[in-house]
Amino acid sequence: MRKFGGSLFGVSLLLSVLLAAATAAAEYYNYGSALDKTFLFFEAQRSGKLPAAQRVKWRGPSGLKDGLAQGVSLEGGYYDAGDHVKFGLPMAFAVTMLSWAAVDNRKELSSSNQMQQTLWSIRWGTDYFIKAHPQPNVLWGQVGDGESDHYCWERPEDMTTSRTAYKLDPYHPGSDLAGETAAALAAASLAFKPFNSSYSALLLSHAKELFSFADKYRGLYTNSIPNAKAFYMSSGYSDELLWAAAWLHRATGDQYYLKYAMDNSGYMGGTGWGVKEFSWDNKYAGVQILLSKILLEGKGGIYTSTLKQYQTKADYFACACLKKNGGYNIQTTPGGLMYVREWNNLQYASAAAYLLAVYSDYLSAANAKLNCPDGLVQPQGLLDFARSQADYILGKNRQGMSYVVGYGPKYPIRVHHRGSSIPSIFAQRSSVSCVQGFDSWYRRSQGDPNVIYGALVGGPDENDNYSDDRSNYEQSEPTLSGTAPLVGLFAKLYGGSLGSYGGGSYKPYETTKPAASSYKATPTTYSPKQSGAQIEFLHSITSNWIAGNTRYYRHKVIIKNNSQKPISDLKLKIEDLSGPIWGLNPTGQKYTYQLPQWQKTLRAGQAYDFVYVQGGPQAKVSVLSYN
């Protein structure tokens, strides 16, 4: 699509649909369920060899030889949208947004047992960026040819189109793309720092080199990779340089990067541009809010005056969203959706909503208010706006439709997406050719054979109208850059409210006290004589609801190491499990699960919890082994 301007297995997916239907019926929005689905979209977009834990089973390995013709391995990364090009600029922006969520919303993501999924989604991108940056002043910025790719309609596993790779170097600069990739890696280093310090340091090293490359050799990446102009035309690179400097300062604390953002604030537009858009192309509002955090924390020092200028522009963006900007406001549809432009408008709404949720937190922490031309606004007002956009996306709109695929009883079923619109290679093993895909699948009036859960489509027009038509790519195509901000937005609205998938007062389901009988929470202890260790499980039911004729229960299990020494490589046996589970990884052996990679060891006295949902009695949890 051209873009102008600037064990979770089958049973769990079926259950998710049932739960979402119950949500819509009650006119509440299940932010936890929506959050869970967004990660499935990123799994559907994966390029390369897929991991054993891949939950989107209709996808197979693809793009395994990417870059080899140019002498570099560029396997991995994400396909951009409904096509199979790996565009570096929007992919890097998506990883930056995922990382921002992991950093600023770690509490909410952890309480919803989604931190692991967030880190995996980030790493699928950052591992690719590391491959794409083999030398300090080289960055491979794109794989695939947008023109030839769009002439074909085929599964990624069947690709016959060009997989040419395009690079940036001192003779072919791209400060915007290199700067955004530096920002992504710096933000990701912060996300991984509490869980994997060595990987965090590696990411930061690449981020520093890429920033130096972007700053020293300046130019638009679309001049060096002309193939990208028709799809992701960059409007400038100054915002990305400031954006990268802001993230590197936050990741390192090095005053060099803050001084860079201060010294170049006027020249590069950071304190000059008041904008009404935040997107893969325009980062000014993000820069302004990120740097305002320093001022709000009282750490401005000698840069206080310049930081105040940055905050003035941050306020301009926020006030424009809230329609309190003295007439210079962002347009909204009759239904209340912010409207920036016709092509894939929801990407702007999702990004702005998350940005205002972030700014709300920064203001609240400083006990400050938003100063608009039309009056002062409490931080809660910004969060309320963010919630209004999220609710519109999830179904509070004229169409009564969720624009997140797979959420709720009504959502787009004819998505402009090659992989989802053609039967899986595991269901139809014969290849689907370039033209055959158009004839047999693109033009079908039926819904997609593979539901691409969690995808945020382009969305409705300025009058809240939406046409569920595969050929209507302006409205029906999902993108990485549009879906990524939803992770932080839904996590924030979930609010860390244990026992409920709603955020704040938004209760997703009818909840009642669980029946006593066989659902009584009881601790169980595992104490093998050979080691003297003691592992305790504490089961509890945190909520329940009715979907159809079945009552479902949300079970929380706390694993506690009651011994005096650490244990590692813990493997659990879970029997009688009939629903989805969060917080544990399947091992490949029947009924066997293990802790995630970032939680390989339980210290003495440490606890870890996981969650599962099912109807009927609780599952049986026991220990198989540990070290």
Swiss-Prot record:
One of its GO terms (biological process) is cell wall organization. Coiled coil: none annotated. Residues 1-26 form the signal peptide. Glycans are attached at residues 196, 465, 561. It comes from the Eukaryota. Gene3D superfamilies: 1.50.10.10. Belongs to the glycosyl hydrolase 9 (cellulase E) family. This is Endoglucanase 5.
